[in-house]
UniProtKB/Swiss-Prot annotation:
UniProt-listed CDD domains: Argininosuccinate_lyase (cd01359)
Family: Belongs to the lyase 1 family. Argininosuccinate lyase subfamily.
Entry-linked InterPro entries: Arg_succ_lyase_C, Argininosuccinate_lyase, Fumarase/histidase_N, Fumarate_lyase_CS, Fumarate_lyase_fam, Fumarate_lyase_N, L-Aspartase-like
Pathway given in the UniProt record: Amino-acid biosynthesis; L-arginine biosynthesis; L-arginine from L-ornithine and carbamoyl phosphate: step 3/3
Signal peptide: none
A biological process term (GO) from this entry: L-arginine biosynthetic process
Protein's UniProt name: Argininosuccinate lyase
Keyword Transferase: no
GO cellular component term of the entry, any: cytosol
Entry's localization field: Cytoplasm
Taxonomic path: Bacteria, Pseudomonadati, Pseudomonadota, Gammaproteobacteria, Legionellales
EC number: 4.3.2.1
Keyword Nucleotidyltransferase: no
Amino acid sequence: MTNKTWGGRFKKSLDSGVNQFNASLSFDHVLFDQDINGSQVHVKQLAKQKILTEVESQAIYSALEEIRSEIKQGQYSFNVRDEEDIHMFIEQLLIQKIGDLGKKLHTGRSRNDQVALDLRLYTRDKGCLINELLTRLIDCLDDLTSKHQQDLMPGYTHLQQAQPVTLGAYFNAYQCMFGRDKSRLEDWFKRMNYSPLGAGALAGSTLPLDREWVAESLGFAGIIPNTLDAVSDRDFVIELCSVAAMIMMHLSRLCEDLILWSTQEFNFVILDDAFATGSSLMPNKKNPDVPELIRGKSGRVYGHLMAILTVMKGLPLAYNKDMQEDKEGLFDTINTIIACLQMITPFLQSLTFNTLLMKTKAQSGYLDATAILESLVMKGMPFRDAHHQVGAWIAEAIEKQCSLNELLKGG
């Protein structure tokens, strides 16, 4: 028999290498708050259902609260040790505090439904924070849209000047993108906000558990009715990583534009000293590290999405140890997107836009070609003929080094 909580049928102790390879405490300890919340509601339920006494339930509840406080105060390290994960770590601390009564915590529960619950609580908490940060970004873009709604600038396709637009319209385009991201996140929340607790390892429990009461107490919309699905589902992880990848893609595109605009060749944007860095060699440099880092970090978020999709694609029902690999990528995705969203809004607010140069660029060149083409169409000329005619005028204007208006007035 081993000293593991599951060691009753084993005659040998776990190999030390396997113990380290198997352990997840070094990274899943971030779930401690959600794990304790779930356990506290679970023991309340056990008392409600007369499986534990009220005195037992309250003793466990209070000890768990002490453990939460001690963890927050940094009293414990989370290096690899005998406990595999944060769930067993907390349970062993509980047993040390209150003795054999602590062994009753896991009554009617498996780590399979326990970790599924913790992940849902964790992603829900972080999803709400991401939603809040998205709202701040959208509000910032709305302010920039209003402030610059009359400021002309060149619009681009293929990174070539195309037609005049306004700087306000540019920011409104990103406001629309992040608005869709916010809608996707809120849609994800509706699907993920269901409780798996009570599903046990995969087939529920013979104990008279009240899954609906637990779900309501934890703020869920309801329970996941199929217990196999409850413990094996990681769609909510994949979907959150997918939404995060979309957000990062939009952030990366926005940052790409701002990086280009900050070059001397464009000179549309002046970086604030507080949000730029210099060179260790070249004293003339002012580098856009903030948008470059955000652009670069999109790749790691994409990678985590591909990783969890690959982990899940070949798994039979129900739980498999492969699913331990869902966490590090998820945690890094969440940390990355929160960091990027926390940085992008003040960065945008710090920028100074060279609106006079933008206007000059928008009014020079041949950005008015499409408007002239359409004026010919309104006079009855077939579109293709008008397109050909304006193209010929542009070629002539380029040769004469003048604008279209100057060419047409001269004619």
